Curated annotation (Swiss-Prot):
This is Uncharacterized protein AF_1573. It is found in: Membrane. It comes from Archaeoglobus fulgidus (strain ATCC 49558 / DSM 4304 / JCM 9628 / NBRC 100126 / VC-16). It is a single-pass membrane protein. It comes from the Archaea. The chain crosses the membrane at residues 17-39. Keywords: Membrane, Transmembrane, Transmembrane helix.
Length: 131
């Protein structure tokens, strides 16, 4: 009589699961990488009808720091109070703008938007999001 082997089937199942994971892991990783290549961020801005409690001012110095902002802010001048607009930014520019404006907002305190600022003679509320 042959002695029974315990766990033979269980050991084979574990090997199959591990093999399946090793095969699928690179496929999942590649799929995620391909899906994130075209990422972008949206910069949502609303012209406010009254000054927020805490805001910072956007100046020419800010445009020297983040040149991409100049075109956006020139376009914002066209908005009437209560109107809003969104701008699509590539992920690197979006992160750069977010970090810069977050730092400026932290210097003046929180507002009802992520960022509250004055540009020219108008006040704006803005936040970042994904399209």
């Amino acid at each position: 009589m042959r002695p029974q082997q315990y766990g033979g089937e269980c050991g084979m199942k574990k090997k199959h699961v591990i093999l399946l994971i090793l095969i699928l892991l690179p496929v999942v990783f590649l799929h995620i990488m391909l899906a994130t290549w075209g990422l972008s961020m949206s910069f949502y801005v609303k012209r406010l009808s009254s000054p927020p409690q805490n805001y910072f001012e956007i100046t020419e110095e800010d445009f020297r720091e983040i040149p991409e902002l100049k075109k956006i802010f020139e376009d914002l001048r066209k908005l009437a109070p209560g109107e809003s607009r969104s701008y699509e930014l590539d992920i690197d520019t979006g992160n750069k703008v977010h970090s810069y404006l977050t730092e400026k907002q932290a210097g003046v305190g929180e507002c009802s938007y992520t960022y509250c600022f004055k540009y020219g003679d108008a006040y704006y509320g803005a936040h970042m999001g994904t399209p």
